[in-house]
Amino acid sequence: MSDTEYLTRAEAVLAAVERTVDDANDGDHDIDLERNGSVLTLTFENGSKIIVNLQPPMKEVWIAAKAGGFHYRFIDGEWRDTRTGTEFFSALTEYATQQAGLPITFNAP
C-alpha cells in the first residue's frame, strides 16, 4: 500500500470514530473527544480513556485501551489486529462499550 493510500484509509478510520462519538453524544453518552494531529483521545465519564492513533511508518492504526494496546494493519479490505486478526471497529466497539458502561457501536466508513 502506498503512503497516500494508507493516509486516505487511516484518516477515514479517524473520521468514522469522530462521527460515531458525535452521534453517541447526541444520545445517552458523554464522551469527550480530542484530536491532536493523527491522535484521537476518547475520555469517558468515569475518566478512562481510549487513544486511537496512526502510525504512518508502519502503515498501522493503534488502539490503547484499558484492555491493552493493539496494532491494526489493512488486510483484505479491513483493518485487522496484527496478532489476533480481530477487525478494528468490532474491537473498538467492545473496548468503548466496556469503558463507557453503555453500548456504543463503531462501524467501518
UniProtKB/Swiss-Prot annotation:
> Does the keyword Signal feature in the UniProt annotation?
no
Alphabetical list of SMART domains matching this protein: Frataxin_Cyay
**InterPro entries on file:** CyaY, Frataxin/CyaY, Frataxin/CyaY_sf, Frataxin_CS
Q: Name one Pfam family in it.
A: Frataxin_Cyay
Origin superkingdom? Bacteria
The keyword Iron belongs to this UniProt entry's keyword annotation: yes
The Gene Ontology CC terms held by the record are: cytosol
What role is this protein assigned?
Involved in iron-sulfur (Fe-S) cluster assembly. May act as a regulator of Fe-S biogenesis.
PANTHER family recorded for this chain?
Answer: FRATAXIN (PTHR16821), FRATAXIN, MITOCHONDRIAL (PTHR16821:SF2)
Family per record: Belongs to the frataxin family.
Protein name as catalogued: Iron-sulfur cluster assembly protein CyaY
Q: Which organism is it from?
A: Burkholderia lata (strain ATCC 17760 / DSM 23089 / LMG 22485 / NCIMB 9086 / R18194 / 383)
Q: Which gene encodes it?
A: cyaY
